[in-house]
């Protein structure tokens, strides 16, 4: 069984082998029978002349392989025999020297008995050869306005044979400018040959074609090793666009096909389009599109196609660079400002140390008063142009970044202050608006001062008297009320008060006069100005000793200004005038007796009207009174050193103990120390030992019309004579009506109250409406000529003292009209005028040279 199966399998294998061999033999036989001998006649002629071309080489290619070849005779024909298989395509090519080769496909549908083919050759055009030192240029021989094809390459790329020279060279350049000329080039069948051998053939869509050669004298080609730059003008009917890319194909004569070599670009030269490419060698070139890329690849120029994108990128980069530059400048500015601020702080600390000792000087040590930081409201505008100005500096809690910011801030605040100082409504409405605050705050101030007086009256006494100026009210409206009291020369006294509203200051930063710390004091006498006035009328609190002035007083009556008593020139009728600075123990009994007599004398006579009472009586009774600048006369001002305004005073320095009562008596010659006529301010930061103090009759200097001031004086010497005389008349009428005792008796009677009690009085600021509007809110007068209406001292008793408002109302109801001025006062005025005539003979500089000099703190 097994043997028969094996025989059957063997028989099957043998049968398959025999059948395969037989089928292969039959296939080969059929193929051999299909390839038959075919004779092909090829006729070659000149395209331009149609003359036959002899000795032209005919070559037939089948699948890029030469199948047969032949040569034309004198008649330009050639008979070529070949094996042709039905269905295959043949490429018949004719070449001739000095002609552009041409080829044509041949593919019959059936096996022909006879076939003939004609090829026209395009003669190559001679070109102009230009050999330069660096390049070799070939230009078409046709000259004209239109662009001509051109070829150039480097001279060193040209390799001449050993026996050849440049004069043996001949150049040919042929460009197809018409479609029929393009047809004269070889058949446009492209091949994308690859290494696998599987070549695909396809037809090309031509754009233009060009042929260029460089031949030797024997007709051989001269090789060129290097890039060859070719530019060919395109036909006018071309539909290509600028920057379009068209492939460049080279004709391979060995295979009879076009091979892709490089990429050319379409460029615009004027109104003509050109195709430019780089050829690796000379030969036959065509610009054509392949079926895989039927349309030209148009590549837009990045500078035009992506303009917006590029601009956005550049803008972003510029913005980033700008931000980085700003940050760099910011940090550099901060680094530059830090050392400057540190240097300013060092200068400020040095200036503060010096100002503690040398801010202001007079007959005694003003540097015994230690300053603290205090912000003063500035309500004054521009100072009088005829007044020597001393510009004070104010330490504030705000630092300015630059000098420009400081100057602009000062201008803004000065303008704001000037605008707010102008009256915007009736004075009566402003007064009624603040009347309730005045009544309440005045009572509170009187009670507080009485409480401190009772607690400090048992303390030991010092030789100095302190004056504390407390504002009467501290409302958020911050209205400045300036009272002016006048007594006209008519039959009945006419007392009027003029008030000027001031700007409200809800925030300290808005109206505080801020100035740089470097400018502590101006060094020029031409830049002296009146010191900044108080914001509004306040309390004048007189203490017998500096020990009664403690920190608790400041906390209850802030803002406060403490001034030694001998720095203030009080009016002649004031009880503190010519008061001795030394009160010995032996005089204590006499003082108490005089105090009792003074109390009895005050009960017998009506008290004088205070400034506040006169103002209130006038506002209550004077309905319909016309406010006029002719009725308002400014009294002579009390000038305070500007440095005292800068540093609010808190405590007395320990050096006050060095000036004992005995030393003061020795300096005064046993007589009370005269009141100072001027303050002297250290403008250059020197110590008190280097400052000379002088005493000059500033009242006389003001009477002779001089507008000059001492270099070290802060006194306003520009007081009008008319204001002084009218003020003297008013005081004379008041004194005669109230029947005051003589000046010496009045001083002796009022010395009793100085020892134990604290007197409260209302500061009166009189304004001169004839001055510039910027001085409306500032009450300034010299200390010698100041004659405010001061209230009588309060009674010393254990009972509760009536408030200031109640006392004012009581005095107002009990007051009577004041008579006219007495003849005695008129006589005094005449004496003053006589003194003016005598003083006019001396110039201010002579009086300055004649003043006595006195130096303090000599060591």
Swiss-Prot record:
Q: Where is the composition biased (Polar residues)?
A: 484-497, 797-806
Q: Which residues lie on this side of the membrane: Extracellular?
A: 21-307
Q: Does the keyword Cytoplasm apply?
A: no
Positions on the Cytoplasmic side per record topology = 329-859
Q: What GO cellular-component annotations does this UniProt entry give?
A: plasma membrane
Q: Which residues cross the membrane?
A: 308-328
Its biological function? May be involved in the regulation of the cytoskeletal dynamics, plays a role in actin stress fiber formation.
Glycan attachment sites: 163, 194, 198
Q: What is this protein called?
A: Protein FAM171A1
Keyword Cell membrane applies: yes
Which residues constitute the signal peptide according to the record? 1-20
Q: Which keywords belong to this entry?
A: Cell membrane, Glycoprotein, Membrane, Signal, Transmembrane, Transmembrane helix
Question: Which residue windows does the record flag with biased composition (Basic and acidic residues)?
Answer: 400-416, 838-852
